C-alpha cells in the first residue's frame, strides 16, 4: 500500500524514533509499504518518520544509481535494503560535499558535507544483526536516512545564508502550499494527492 509522505513542517519529522523490539507481521507489512511508497515516489531512501511512524527503521534502494555507484568503484549490496535500529559505529574524518534532496522537502536540493565513509550496525529485514561499511553515495544515503530517525533533516546542516534563501519555499511547505508526484501529508494532517 502506498503511504502518504509527511512534508516539511510536520512534527512527525522532528520526533525521535523508538527502537524496534521484535520482528512481527505488522513490521513486515510496514517494510513492504515503505518500499512500495519509496518506489512510487521515485526515491532512493525512506525513513519511518516520513510516513508518520515512530519505528527506528528506514529502507533504501539505490538501483537507479547503480551505474554511477559502479563507476565510482563502490560495491552495491543487493537492493532494496532494510535498516532496523541502525547506528553509525564509525565514520571517517574525511568529508565530501554533495547535493541532497528529500521526499519530505519536494523540489529542494542543497549541498551537504558528510563523512565520506561510515560503518553502520543494524538489523536486516529478517531481524539478523549486520554490519556494513559504506562509502560514496551509499554512505550518504544511509547517513541522510539515519538522521531522519533522530528528527534531523538535511536542511539543518545548511548555513544561515542558505537557509535564508530557502525561507520562502520552506514556508510554503509549512503552509500546505506544496505539490509532488506522490501523496503528501501537511503539518495540519491534511492529505495532498499526487499531482
UniProtKB/Swiss-Prot annotation:
SUPFAM superfamilies tied to this protein: Peptide deformylase
Entry's Gene Ontology BP terms: co-translational protein modification; translation
A Gene Ontology molecular function term of the record: peptide deformylase activity
Chemical reaction(s) catalysed: N-terminal N-formyl-L-methionyl-[peptide] + H2O = N-terminal L-methionyl-[peptide] + formate
Catalytic residues (positions): 145
Cofactor-binding details, from the entry: Binds 1 Fe(2+) ion.
Gene3D superfamilies the record matches: Peptide deformylase
InterPro entries (UniProt xref): Peptide_deformylase, Peptide_deformylase_sf
Keyword Acyltransferase: no
Keyword Hydrolase: yes
EC number(s) given by UniProt: 3.5.1.88
Binding residues for Fe cation: 102, 144, 148
Keyword annotations of the record: Hydrolase, Iron, Metal-binding, Protein biosynthesis
Enzyme class: hydrolase
Cofactor: Fe(2+)
TM spans (from-to): none
Family the UniProt entry places it in: Belongs to the polypeptide deformylase family.
Function, as annotated: Removes the formyl group from the N-terminal Met of newly synthesized proteins. Requires at least a dipeptide for an efficient rate of reaction. N-terminal L-methionine is a prerequisite for activity but the enzyme has broad specificity at other positions.
Protein name: Peptide deformylase
Originating organism: Salinibacter ruber (strain DSM 13855 / M31)
Lineage: Bacteria, Pseudomonadati, Rhodothermota, Rhodothermia, Rhodothermales
Amino acid at each position: 500500500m502506498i503511504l502518504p509522505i509527511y512534508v516539511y513542517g510536520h512534527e512527525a519529522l522532528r520526533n525521535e524514533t523508538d527502537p524496534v523490539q521484535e520482528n512481527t507481521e505488522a513490521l513486515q507489512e510496514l517494510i513492504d509499504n515503505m518500499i512500495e511508497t519509496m518506489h512510487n515516489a521515485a526515491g532512493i531512501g525512506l525513513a519511518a518518520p516520513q510516513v508518520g511512524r515512530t519505528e527506528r527503521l528506514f529502507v533504501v534502494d539505490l538501483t537507479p544509481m547503480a551505474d554511477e555507484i559502479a563507476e565510482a568503484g563502490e560495491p552495491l549490496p543487493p537492493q532494496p535494503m532494510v535498516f532496523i535500529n541502525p547506528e553509525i559505529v564509525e565514520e571517517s574524518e574525511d568529508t565530501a560535499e554533495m547535493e541532497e534532496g528529500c521526499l519530505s522537502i519536494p523540489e529542494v536540493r542543497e549541498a551537504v558535507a558528510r563523512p565520506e565513509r561510515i560503518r553502520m550496525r543494524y538489523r536486516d529485514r529478517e531481524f539478523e544483526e549486520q554490519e556494513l561499511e559504506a562509502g560514496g553515495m551509499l554512505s550518504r544515503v544511509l547517513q541522510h536516512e539515519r538522521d531522519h530517525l533522530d528528527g534531523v533533516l538535511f536542511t539543518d546542516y545548511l548555513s544561515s545564508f542558505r537557509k535564508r534563501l530557502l525561507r520562502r519555499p520552506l514556508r510554503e511547505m509549512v503552509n500546505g502550499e506544496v505539490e509532488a508526484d506522490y501523496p503528501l501529508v501537511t503539518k495540519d494532517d491534511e492529505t495532498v494527492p499526487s499531482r
